[in-house]
């Protein structure tokens, strides 16, 4: 017997204004409260298949997820993979010249065996990067150097290390990976000039960005696509700083093919319209757009509470309706969005269970038992929802 969604809207007055909150009771078709009682796991439609006429559907993966029950989830529901951590600099080259390929290779092999596309994340970042990159020849932090001549020597050394690293990585994977996050999270509106004040920037200015893209193109050739990736790209201030950076780089002939919009959002913010506005703005530069790290926290950013194992039905329903709104908008803009990649596949292993605080979060389409949530049905088969 099917169970359905019932909605009841209550108007809540606050000192700050009036807002509408859905007091919703969801009885859906999955898991304990959301599955049609007659539906088996084998009858659940493929997420990737549902979007075959729009764009590939991807998910971040760890090497340990390539076997077992969770591996079956990836095989059925996505046709694109990205390494959540295994291809970051600290994982691939913990010390200079000491490359550790095994975990990344395992993900590449899993993708090839299952006919999946791959994205690379990420060649350059301010986090999860060995400190050795920015140490001088004597092992001292380059950022602490004050002598102009030595600073110039350090700049050249850092950029040479960057080129060497990129060349080694790209040459290894260019035949298997066609979509590359070259630089990640270089914009920080609160830092001087809007550029993140990382060691990369302190030592080279924006030159490291240019060098990274040129080195990647040189090693990988014209068949691979190169992206600049960041979070909160919907925020008008951050978006415009990123836009001007990319525009200036393109004018200098830097080979950038697209923008990666991480899209770590929550069930309340940001408005979907802002996400689409940003995508359209970068498309105006002739660039591709990818949703690269999609998830949707059930908590607002400033909320540090924890539902534990008792997430209210109305919260899951809000999430479902918001995912539906987002995907409807993305489908309408399929000509300028080439892929949508989730940052994980099951709530059980989401990074948001530990960030910004340790708690139970549920940002993805599959629950801790690997069963589809209301959000899954909202974007795959909205007929399962009833007003």
From Swiss-Prot:
Temperature and thermostability: Optimum temperature is 80 degrees Celsius.
Record domain GH10: where: 41-382
PROSITE patterns, A to Z: GH10_1, GH10_2
GO molecular function: cellulase activity; endo-1,4-beta-xylanase activity
pH-activity relationship: Optimum pH is 7.0.
A single BP term in Gene Ontology: xylan catabolic process
Pathway assigned in UniProt: Glycan degradation; xylan degradation
Broad enzyme group: hydrolase
Catalysed reaction, written as an equation: Endohydrolysis of (1->4)-beta-D-glucosidic linkages in cellulose, lichenin and cereal beta-D-glucans; Endohydrolysis of (1->4)-beta-D-xylosidic linkages in xylans
UniProt superkingdom: Bacteria
Keyword list, A-Z: Carbohydrate metabolism, Cellulose degradation, Glycosidase, Hydrolase, Polysaccharide degradation, Xylan degradation
Name of this protein: Thermostable celloxylanase
Organism encoding this protein: Thermoclostridium stercorarium
């Amino acid at each position: 017997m099917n169970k359905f969604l019932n909605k009841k809207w209550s108007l809540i007055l606050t000192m700050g204004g009036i807002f509408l909150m859905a007091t919703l009771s969801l009885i859906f078709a999955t898991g304990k409260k959301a599955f049609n009682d007659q539906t088996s796991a084998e009858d659940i439609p493929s997420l990737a298949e549902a979007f075959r006429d729009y764009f590939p559907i991807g998910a971040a993966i760890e090497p340990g997820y390539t076997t077992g029950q969770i591996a079956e989830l990836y095989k059925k529901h996505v046709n694109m993979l990205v390494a959540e951590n295994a291809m970051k600099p600290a994982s691939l080259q913990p010390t200079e010249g000491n490359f550790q390929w095994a975990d990344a290779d395992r993900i590449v092999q899993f993708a090839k065996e299952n006919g999946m596309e791959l994205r690379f994340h990420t060649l350059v970042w301010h986090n999860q990067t060995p400190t050795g990159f920015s140490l001088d020849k004597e092992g001292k932090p380059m950022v602490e150097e004050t002598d102009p001549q030595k600073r110039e020597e350090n700049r050249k050394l850092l950029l040479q290390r960057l080129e060497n690293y990129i060349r080694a990585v790209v040459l290894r994977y260019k035949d298997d990976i066609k979509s590359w996050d070259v630089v990640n999270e270089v914009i920080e509106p609160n830092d001087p000039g809007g550029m993140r004040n990382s060691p990369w920037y302190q030592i080279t200015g924006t030159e490291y960005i240019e060098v990274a893209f040129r080195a990647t193109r040189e090693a990988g050739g014209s068949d691979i696509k190169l992206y600049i990736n960041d979070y909160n790209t919907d925020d008008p201030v951050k978006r415009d700083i990123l836009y001007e950076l990319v525009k200036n780089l393109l004018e200098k002939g830097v080979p950038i093919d697209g923008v990666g919009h991480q899209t770590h959002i929550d069930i309340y913010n940001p408005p979907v319209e802002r996400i689409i506005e940003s995508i359209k703005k970068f498309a105006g530069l002739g660039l591709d757009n990818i949703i690269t790290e999609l998830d949707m926290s059930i908590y607002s950013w400033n909320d540090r509470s924890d539902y534990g194992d008792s997430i209210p039905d109305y919260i899951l329903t809000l999430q479902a309706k918001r995912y539906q709104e987002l995907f409807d908008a993305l489908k309408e803009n399929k000509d300028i969005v080439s892929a949508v990649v989730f940052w994980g596949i099951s709530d059980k292993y989401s990074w948001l269970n530990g960030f910004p605080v340790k708690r139970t979060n549920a940002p993805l389409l599959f629950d801790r038992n690997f069963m589809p949530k209301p959000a899954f049905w909202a974007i795959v088969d909205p007929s399962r929802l009833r007003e």
